[in-house]
From Swiss-Prot:
Its EC number is 1.15.1.1. It catalyses: 2 superoxide + 2 H(+) = H2O2 + O2. Keywords: Iron, Manganese, Metal-binding, Oxidoreductase, Stress response. It comes from the Bacteria. Its cofactor is Mn(2+); Fe(3+). Binds 1 Mn(2+) or Fe(3+) ion per subunit. Pfam families: Sod_Fe_C, Sod_Fe_N. Mn(2+) binds at residues 27, 81, 161, 165. One of its GO terms (cellular component) is cytoplasm. Homodimer. The keyword Transport does not apply. InterPro entries: Mn/Fe_SOD, Mn/Fe_SOD_BS, Mn/Fe_SOD_C, Mn/Fe_SOD_N, Mn/Fe_SOD_N_sf, SOD_C_sf. This is Superoxide dismutase [Mn/Fe]. The lineage of its organism: Bacteria, Bacillati, Bacillota, Bacilli, Bacillales.
């Protein structure tokens, strides 16, 4: 198979009480695994099997039209979730160069969190909220479904899944509560690493 489900870098219950064990098990083992399975099925026998998922999603226009939708949805789902797991950590420490850059652009970390949370909560239906690097500047964007900002030439360095499957077992229809809890488990070390890689 061309693409594989990555292991979580922590235990299923490591993010509790903010993200519960059952949600993590279903989200990783079922939802993400399904994206991988369907992506592999779509690209089987094509030259896409030899490409990285980042390269594929960044160049969706070059994907054959008969599999483009399947690759966009499932390739995006695989890429987004692979990144999402790494952006979470039970040891969240708000420090590093990216935090300084956020404070410089937004005035404070709280102002940044408020704008990010507002945009994540306002994302209609299923999708993602992102902090991206765009031409050297930080920007908050949202994408529908499993779309990823790299398709538009932007580099995601922080992402939040706001599909209901990411939070409904614990938070039901209270998406803002889930968004607030997210800040307790952000892996700022990884965010910094991704930010520094864009320089």
């Amino acid at each position: 198979m061309a693409f594989e489900l990555p292991n979580l870098p922590y235990a299923y219950d490591a993010l509790e009480p903010h993200i519960d064990k059952q949600t993590m098990e279903i989200h990783h083992d079922k939802h993400h695994n399904t994206y991988v399975t369907k992506l592999n099925s779509a690209v089987e026998g094509t030259d896409l099997e030899a490409k990285s998922i980042e390269e594929i999603v960044a160049n969706l226009d070059s994907v054959p039209s008969n599999i483009q939708t399947a690759v966009r949805n499932n390739g995006g789902g695989h890429l987004n979730h692979s990144l999402f797991w790494e952006l979470l950590s039970p040891n969240s420490e708000e420090k590093g160069e990216v935090v300084d850059k956020i404070k410089e652009q937004w005035g404070s970390l709280d102002e940044f969190k408020k704008e990010f949370a507002d945009k994540a909560a306002a994302r209609f239906g299923s999708g993602w909220a992102w902090l991206v690097v765009n031409n050297g500047q930080l920007e908050i964007v949202t994408t529908p479904n499993q779309d990823n900002p790299i398709t538009e030439g932007k580099t995601p360095i922080l992402g939040l899944d706001v599909w209901e499957h990411a939070y409904y077992l614990k938070y039901q229809n209270k998406r803002p509560d889930y968004i607030n809890a997210f800040w307790n488990v952000v892996n700022w070390e990884k965010v910094n690493e991704l930010y520094n890689a864009t320089k």
